[in-house]
A protein has these predicted regions:
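Conserved catalytic or regulatory cores that recognize and/or transform ribose-phosphate-containing ligands
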Residues: 1-158
Length: 158
């Protein structure tokens, strides 16, 4: 699932009333009244040759958790299914019979959908790979389709 990011991020474009480009936790705090949903990349960042790597998953979780902390310090209550997904996968060995594919897009999209529908604002931090992540694209498309403000930390492409 690919999006036309240049169209979404265009100043004065069709989505400019909903999309804030170059946002940050302070701006999110000024515009958020409710739960923020932090959409961060995962699947493409945590694999090599279609094999899930816990070391990469841990790094992705830390990078996304850093953004949760930055929002927390700005007094924004935020959830990040990427962090919950990563940490659940890190714990798989502690639960008998737990077999979940960390790279199963459809499973994780369905699992995270109930969190997404509670969001009052969608935040996409500038974590490497955000533009190519199918889950981030799904989240942003859903937000735009449902009139939920989108805050992109990345600036306009040069």
């Amino acid at each position: 699932h690919s999006l036309d990011w240049s169209g979404i991020m265009a100043p004065g474009g069709a989505w400019s009333a909903l999309v804030r480009v170059g946002s940050d936790p302070g701006m999110v705090a000024r515009h958020c009244s409710g739960v923020a949903y932090l959409s961060a990349p995962y699947a493409d960042q945590v694999q090599a040759r279609r094999k899930w790597l816990i070391e990469r998953s841990t790094m992705v979780s830390v990078l996304a958790s850093r953004e949760i902390l930055r929002l927390t310090l700005a007094r924004v209550s935020a959830i990040c299914p990427t962090v919950m997904r990563a940490e659940a996968m890190h714990a798989v060995g502690t639960v008998d019979g737990a077999e979940v594919d960390p790279l199963d897009h459809d499973f994780w999209a369905a699992w995270s959908a109930p969190f997404l529908v509670t969001a009052k604002i969608l935040v996409v931090p500038a974590i490497r790979g955000w533009q190519r992540c199918p889950m981030v694209a799904r989240d942003v498309q859903w937000a735009l389709d449902h009139n939920v403000p989108v805050h992109l930390y990345a600036g306009l492409p040069a």
